[in-house]
């Protein structure tokens, strides 16, 4: 019943638009933090055309499981980490065997939560606050 009530207030189109805005915001936030993607890399397309509200990242210098554990234990940010039951896809993407950290966004997420995640990623990866960062770190 709660799901139906939610959908009566918010159309599927509104939810999708919101989720894709968050996806673009998060990708742009990562690219603002690390334009050359040396410490934090977006895996896959850098735009929202033909994608869903999921963003996978890789931190080449830090173990993916360690980074995901720190996101959870230190910042309360839940992610999924690893090969996501798709090792062949990760081989194709060049992220095997480490995998990625996967963030997904839903209709209840906010830009403030994404700012918290971006700030946590900046701290974990050692990225420093610098010019070009637009999300207020």
Can you name each region flagged by the protein language model?
Residues 1-137:
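Pyridoxal 5′-phosphate
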């Amino acid at each position: 019943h709660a799901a139906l009530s939610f959908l009566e207030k918010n159309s599927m189109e509104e939810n999708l638009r919101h989720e894709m805005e968050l996806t673009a915001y998060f990708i742009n936030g990562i690219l603002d933090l690390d334009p050359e993607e040396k410490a934090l890399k977006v895996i896959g397309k850098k735009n929202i055309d033909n994608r869903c509200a999921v963003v996978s990242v890789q931190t080449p210098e830090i173990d993916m499981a360690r980074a995901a554990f720190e996101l959870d234990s230190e910042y309360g940010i839940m992610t999924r980490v690893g090969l996501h039951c798709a090792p062949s896809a990760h081989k194709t993407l060049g992220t095997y065997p480490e995998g990625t950290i996967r963030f997904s966004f839903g209709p209840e997420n906010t830009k403030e939560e994404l700012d918290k995640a971006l700030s946590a990623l900046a701290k974990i990866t050692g990225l420093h606050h610098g010019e070009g960062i637009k999300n207020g770190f």
